[in-house]
A protein has these predicted regions:
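Extracellular/virion structural assembly segments
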Residues: 1-159
């Protein structure tokens, strides 16, 4: 399992990527692979177990252990991430580009580890980029030879 305190800017310490805040320890984000980045983050499918009673009331019967995130990260640039030999099931640590927020004044607390230096307060809300320990679920890349672009997508779920 990767070390969560490690700065996962790139697997090769000689070529850190100064072009993005995205870090993927275990895969790496080389220079020229991170333009056009997008990240979605949401609950895993098993997190939602809602059922209706015989009277029609909606009840949440989900197990708190399933309160985990899934994420999809995609980009289009001139180079791909280091996907070679990185198969589904590999544990990785993602310093997200997507942000989460909570409201301490309402008794809410931060639910995930924050990427160091990413926390900020906006009015009553605290916003941060989470650091997630995940397993690769799937990835793909496509090459546009004539356009000299490589598109890629990484799907991962929190362990």
């Amino acid at each position: 399992m990767p070390d969560p305190s490690y700065d996962a800017s790139h697997d090769d310490p000689l070529t850190p990527n100064a072009f993005t805040v995205l870090r993927i320890q275990g895969v790496g984000v080389p220079p020229y692979s991170a333009r056009g980045l997008r990240q979605s983050i949401g609950p895993i499918d098993q997190a939602s177990q809602n059922r209706r009673t015989v009277n029609g009331a909606l009840k949440d019967i989900s197990f708190s252990g399933f309160q985990k995130y899934k994420t999809t990260i995609s980009g289009t640039d001139q180079r791909p991430p280091n996907f070679d030999g990185k198969w589904p099931g590999l544990t990785i640590i993602i310093d997200c580009i997507a942000e989460l927020s909570y409201t301490p004044d309402e008794g809410e607390t931060q639910q995930r580890t924050a990427v160091p230096g990413s926390e900020r307060v906006e009015a009553a809300h605290t916003v941060y980029r989470p650091r997630l320990t995940c397993k690769i679920m799937n990835f793909n890349q496509d090459h546009d030879e004539y356009g000299a672009q490589i598109g890629w997508t990484l799907d991962a779920e929190e362990v």
